[in-house]
Amino acid sequence: MLKILQAAEFDRCIELAYELAMDPARSGYPTYCDGMKTKGDFVERTRASMERSDEDVLVFEENGTVEGVIAFQHQEGERYLHVHCLSIRKDTGRALEEFVAYCRERWPGAMLDVGLPAENVDARSWLEGQGVPCIERSWNYLFDLSGYQPAAEVSGVRPVTEENFEEFAAIHRRVQGEMYWNCERIRKAMADWHLFITGTGDEAGEVILTGFGSNEHQEIFALGFADGKYRAEPFRALLTAALHLLKEKGTRWLTFFVDVGGPEKEVLDKMGFRCVGEFQAYRVKL
């Protein structure tokens, strides 16, 4: 049975939720098995969901025993839901079935995204058994900037500003597809991003970095080329420009997801990125 987690029950449930979050076979994304995020981070993030009007925390019980916790965000205006804690000890399929039914009743017609480690076979099997498509399979790479020493400045890479945003937009419109963060949304939230471009025409490339204030963990949201073809040296240049900027701003960790089997692996490995594991994303139409 799923029910809203009450504040008085938080301490009783959070220990189990964190224990499960440290097991990729019993948890979802974002993963806490990466050696970066801490128990304190997990507790703080989950507690924050209890206080936010656009987030909920549910507890999954069977026969009066707590078996898991699900926390998620629901963006009402966008009709979009996103799970950020999925810690289930057993009967994962039943928990997901109840969760999807709960969301479908409250937000019919919305989209629900669920991210999972490849190891969480129970969750993946239930979703796939319901015909839910896997929309992304990526390697989760992590870079520790604490020992990073920037080399010489990178030539040919240009930061994006309001003045040259259309250069960036000309690239991003060709690669954005159905992604939420399209040109229009990025432009409206320029303060939340760091953008770089390189090259021109079909060979032009872009890198999009999160820029959430003083957060010591940032993420590369996208790095690609206008014609969709991978080019190792421009890729390395864009990535290096991103690392230089993040080091300057005091960032400690950088996350970068790349397609499983993609050619980026060689450059990432040589630059010192560490592969945390495989990420799989599923999208449920409610």
Identify what each model region corresponds to.
Residues 28-94, 98, 203-230:
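Conserved donor-binding loop and adjoining core beta-sheet/short helix segment
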